UniProtKB/Swiss-Prot annotation:
Gene Ontology CC terms: host cell mitochondrion; host cell nucleus
Highest taxon of source: Viruses
Homology family: Belongs to the orthohepadnavirus protein X family.
GO biological process per UniProt: DNA-templated transcription; symbiont-mediated activation of host NF-kappaB cascade; symbiont-mediated arrest of host cell cycle during G2/M transition; viral genome replication
Protein name: Protein X
Organism: Hepatitis B virus genotype A1 subtype adw2 (isolate South Africa/84/2001)
Record lineage: Viruses, Riboviria, Pararnavirae, Artverviricota, Revtraviricetes
Amino acid sequence: MAARLYCQLDSSRDVLCLRPVGAESRGRPLAGPLGALSSPSPSAVPSDHGAHLSLRGLPVCAFSSAGPCALRFTSARCMETTVNAHQILPKVLHKRTLGLPAMSTTDLEAYFKDCVFKDWEELGEEIRLKVFVLGGCRHKLVFAPSSCNFFTSA
């Protein structure tokens, strides 16, 4: 079983939001490089937030009806895809954090829609899930592969 999420660009805040499909909530904005850091309050994620639905590599807040509170996962092994062949994405996000010219938010949105979610949802490649923490989520991972390299912008 896979958690189904979709991303939606909020151009007024330059934030890419991840939201659960069919959820009533508006979701949580991404942290760090794509917008202002938004620390979840203790009530933002209910105590029964779907840990029983755990999927390798996803933090427990990914299953909250409020949506995940920071971008932290990708189905691309070691962040490498046809679009991102040499670990370019972490460098791009780091440049954006520093306010330097980098990939536009529209390009980032296309990357996640076309590469990450296509591999994850359509191909169902759960085994390849890797976790990259890009901001201040307080939630622990359900499972993190020992070979996973973490990139943090915060």
